[in-house]
Amino acid sequence: MEKLSMVTSLLCAITVAVLAVAVVSGEAAVVEHTFVVHEMNATHLCNTTKIYVVNGQFPGPTVDVTEGDTVVVHVINKLPFGLTIHWHGVRQMRSCWADGAGFVTECPIPPGNEHTYRFNVTGQVGTLWWHAHVTCLRATINGAFIVRPRDGKYPFPTPAKDVPIIIGEWWELDLIELDRRMMDGNFDDNPLSATINGKLGDLSNCSRMVEESFILDVKHGESYLLRVINTALFSEYYFRVAGHTFTVVGADGNYLTPFKTDMVTVAPGEAIDVIMVADAPPAHYHMIALANQPPEPDPQIPVFTSRGLVRYAGTTANNNGLPVPMPIMPNQHNTMPSYYFHANLTGLAHPERHRVPMHVDERLFVTLGLGSICRGQNTTCKRRRSPETIVVATMNNVSFAHPKTTALLERYYDGTSKGVYTEDFPIRPPRPFNYTNRDLIPPGPLEEALEPTFKATKLKRFKYNTSVEIIFQSTTLMQSDSNPMHLHGYDVFLLAQGLGNFNAKRDVRKFNYHNPQLRNTVQVPRGGWAAIRFVTDNPGMWYLHCHFEFHIIMGMATAFIVEDGPTPETSLPPPPPEFKRCGNNGLSQP
């Protein structure tokens, strides 16, 4: 946890205390927290930076609940601009109003104001997380959201302890300024280091002052449930502990078939549960979180790494005179371990939850790439790369224009959407092409012919109880990134992933209908595709976006409208009393 400045410390000590109350009612409880969001100063690498935190903590407080509980979080905004809190992965069944997606389900909480989020957590067990959902604030405003089984039983031996491992990034640049620069088309800024639970690690130093490392204390022979969460804005991470192996047992609040590995790959937005047994000779062992990135000709950024420590009870600070073992990490440009890790995971079959829809009502084929538009306009610029153009991210050649003064859900519910959005999000790209041709990465005539792009707020509407299949296809238009796609309000069946261009005749045979993963964030591999299915059983307005922050800001997003079902129990209820409509609420955005 970072140290507070004196003023902020007094503020938090006198006026702000974390309130976490569990009021037992029958089998379920009400778990209540107060989140005070404020600025504070933190010093790393010889520089003091203003950061934005909850209750003086980076990462923020852990929300720890049992399946079936009601969660109540009072958010007090002491920032000079608005923000929302999103409960990443919580299904929010019939509680879309509490999803916390800025300008999608609600307008940001204005400066000096308060807002209460209230929702139930049902049908989910495992690791989720929460984070700010406006601008780049989630880099430091985030925390774990743990859902424990109601009966206290796991489908694996109960661990001695569970520990959140929150992987993030340390930015010296003010996050609000970072957001402004990216909104203006400047993507040259980078974090200075990776972090593990807010610690930069001893590989980072300045003037021979070594940064603090996260330390995991263990006892020989005991097992530990590591809840590995990637909160980073920019990068997917490889995570390894020297001398130890993992058993992957869950992801995104759902159990997985146990999978043994010596390295975890976690994309932005993902939460991976792994069991680590402390079965190595008692000593100290390094853990490493290493960012990966595509090789050239993709744009290159520095290597981000954080190093922590696993420390066995009874061992000495000098590690008994032996060097501390280091894990051997992949080359940062080798993205294949990510593909193999994700493709090898399967869901733990459950007769009630794993009912893959075999009939498909609507199919979408969604390409993910980049394009460019003229500044001040919403269409592709023919002036090539110049100050008059701005690079955007697209889905089927449409870059999402995020609302700035109103919330899409409110307009939909009130029937006042005219002029705010349209419901013609394209279900396929304008024309097929060789989506993974690496000759498209450098800007040029070949890429330019396929690039035509426009910016608009285009949504897709579904009737209640529609069976939907989406093929996400990563492209090499100006870059070849992977794309961690996150759908709010839903768990989706991840039927298959593959490399190259999706081919229906060939690749449908690879679909796993027996025990697919249930995920809220799907890693679409670099130069590849992912196939998902889900049933629209949760009415409301649900944001779909890439979880790379620069892709969100550039427009790789849309929203799905799910209509009400035939009964009150299948319909979105009116907004709760605590919901504040946008209106003239003194909203101040950076």
Swiss-Prot record:
Q: Which Gene3D superfamilies match?
A: Cupredoxins - blue copper proteins
- The encoding gene is LAC19
Question: Keywords of this protein's UniProt record, alphabetized?
Answer: Apoplast, Copper, Glycoprotein, Lignin degradation, Metal-binding, Oxidoreductase, Repeat, Secreted, Signal
Q: Which residues form a coiled coil?
A: none
Matches recorded under Pfam families: Cu-oxidase, Cu-oxidase_2, Cu-oxidase_3
Instruction: Name the source's superkingdom.
Output: Eukaryota
Cited function: Lignin degradation and detoxification of lignin-derived products.
NCBIfam families in UniProt: laccase (TIGR03389)
According to the record, the signal peptide region is 1-28
Residues bound to Cu cation 2 = H88, H131, H547
* Domain (Plastocyanin-like) ranges: 36-152, 161-315, 424-566
- Belongs to which family? Belongs to the multicopper oxidase family.
Q: Look up the EC number in the record and give it.
A: 1.10.3.2
Q: Which catalytic reaction applies to this protein?
A: 4 hydroquinone + O2 = 4 benzosemiquinone + 2 H2O
Give a GO cellular-component term.
Answer: apoplast
**Species this protein is from:** Oryza sativa subsp. japonica
Q: Which GO terms describe its biological process?
A: lignin catabolic process
Q: Which residues cross the membrane?
A: none
Q: Give me the comment on cofactor binding.
A: Binds 4 Cu cations per monomer.
Q: Region Disordered: what ranges?
A: 565-590
Give the lineage. Eukaryota, Viridiplantae, Streptophyta, Embryophyta, Tracheophyta
> Which residues does Cu cation 4 bind?
N483, C546, H551, M556
> Among its keywords, does the record have Lipoprotein?
no
| Residues holding Cu cation 3 | H133, H488, H545
Name of the protein this chain belongs to: Laccase-19
> Do the record's keywords include Metal-binding?
yes
Q: Where does Cu cation 1 bind?
A: H86, H486
Where the protein is mainly located, per its record?
A: secreted
Q: Which GO terms describe its molecular function?
A: copper ion binding; hydroquinone:oxygen oxidoreductase activity; oxidoreductase activity
